[in-house]
A protein has these predicted regions:
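Generic hydrophobic secondary-structure packing signal
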Residues: 49, 99, 352, 395-402
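N-terminal extracellular/luminal ectodomains immediately following the signal peptide in secreted
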Residues: 70-71
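Switch/coupling sub-region of P-loop NTPases
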Residues: 378-404
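Alpha-helical coupling/stalk and coiled-coil linker elements that connect catalytic or binding modules
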Residues: 1-65, 81-91, 95-97, 104, ...
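Extended, well-ordered alpha-helical scaffold/bundle regions in very large, multi-domain proteins
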Residues: 123-126
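Terminal transmembrane helical anchor/hairpin motif
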Residues: 128-129, 134
Length: 404
């Protein structure tokens, strides 16, 4: 299409159609692309898009249903991968892995069922899947999104030490608890937690008889909370090990980030592929709600709409449980003009909008609510001059609108 005036989109309420399609999108990038949909250039490309959406629509009632395609945006991750020596967050690797696995499942699916999805398979065949991305992530991160003990020998040693020292902390605390219980230094509650540390609940009169650090006291002052001295020594060792573990995890994640950095363009390609799948999915889902089909696209100068419905009116009437009347409209090389007459609010503007909107939809790769025997050609331009600029659901006549 050579040009499309913004008034045409407004007159035909094309954005209202897009708003309905957006509701079927699963991804933010997909929804953005749907909102920006405009007519496709070239008849061949239009037909290919219509066939693709038609295939996706057919999958909803098939035993070979297309796998899920949802994903979380990687835009922030792409930004960080473009910065030298940057470090991705642990959750970022889970998102990357999900995008890769989702892409792989779709690629394998379309290879297996190529005979059912010719157009979708052609697109899928162009995706170059790099299995080493997932393999690299799986060597470091487990299925729960945490760094594996086996990610490095150093990390395994540190985590074993952490478990050992943690056990020693518990043992030393229990030993102190029993000791001071025998001396009757403990209050009835015996112990509690202060600042994430187990402490002894010592009667205030015995506070100076207990070795350790005072971390607080009760509101009445009758109980003093003390961390036993031996527990403190092990806790200090534990804190040092936690620090060393965090540093080793950071080193591993930095190495993994650097390993994945060259694959940024591949990840962007996967994301683009999944976004396109989301657009086709939304188009197909919308087509189901309006009984949209792919009409005959002809090279001849013909516009032959049979049993054509205005999609917005159809949706509105469905909510109100009203019947929608279809229309038959034909224009060709010999019958280039139709004169429509009738009373106020008699449906003349609706007919104009039906023809214009369905043509705009078909050239944007959307299936339309018409009889399958309908024929449409492709136009270079779509021009409109419709007096009623109100939403079609308002049922305001052109005459009434201009009186306002």
């Amino acid at each position: 299409m050579k040009g499309l005036h913004p008034n045409t989109l407004t007159d035909l309420e094309f954005d209202h159609v897009l708003d309905q399609i957006v509701m079927f999108g699963h991804t933010e990038d997909g929804k953005k692309q749907i909102s920006a949909l405009r007519p496709i250039q070239g008849q061949k490309n239009i037909v290919t898009e219509l066939k693709t959406v038609e295939e996706y629509k057919a999958s909803f009632g098939s035993d070979q249903g297309i796998p899920a395609h949802g994903y979380d945006s990687l835009s922030r991750i792409h930004h960080h991968l473009g910065i030298e020596n940057s470090l991705l967050e642990l959750s970022d690797f889970k998102k990357i892995r999900h995008v890769c696995i989702t892409t792989q499942s779709l690629v394998l699916f379309f290879k297996k069922y190529q005979e059912f999805y010719l157009e979708l398979s052609r697109v899928s065949d162009q995706v170059v899947y790099r299995s080493e991305v997932v393999q690299s992530i799986d060597q470091v991160i487990d299925k729960y999104g945490q760094v594996k003990d086996q990610a490095s020998e150093q990390l395994m040693v540190l985590r074993k030490s952490l478990l050992k020292v943690k056990g020693m902390i518990n043992q030393s605390f229990v030993k102190a608890l029993r000791h001071y219980a025998q001396l009757d230094y403990l209050d009835e509650i015996r112990e509690t937690v202060v600042d994430n540390k187990r402490v002894l609940a010592i009667k205030a009169m015995h506070r100076k008889k207990v070795k350790g650090m005072v971390l607080g006291h009760s509101k009445t002052g009758s109980i003093v909370y003390i961390e036993p001295q031996q527990t403190i020594e092990f806790a200090q060792e534990f804190s040092q090990l936690v620090y060393l573990e965090a540093e080793e995890v950071k080193r591993l994640l930095k190495a993994l980030t650097n390993l994945l950095r060259p694959y940024s363009s591949s990840l962007a390609a996967y994301e683009g592929y999944l976004t396109q799948m989301d657009v086709w999915h939304a188009k197909a889902r919308y087509a189901l709600t309006i009984n949209g089909i792919r009409p005959i696209i002809t090279d001849h100068r013909v516009l032959d709409l049979k049993q054509a419905y205005h999609p917005l009116l159809l949706a509105s009437h469905r909510v109100d449980k009203k019947f929608t009347h279809p229309q038959d409209i034909i224009l060709d090389a010999e019958r280039r003009i139709i004169v429509i007459s009738g009373p106020n609010a008699g449906g003349k503007s609706i007919t104009l909008k039906t023809v214009g909107l369905l043509q705009l939809m078909i050239q944007s790769g959307l299936l339309i609510p018409v009889d399958p025997s309908s024929e449409l050609c492709i136009f270079d331009r779509i021009l409109t001059d419709i007096g009623d600029h109100q939403s079609i659901e308002n049922h305001l006549s052109t005459y009434s609108y201009r009186l306002k």
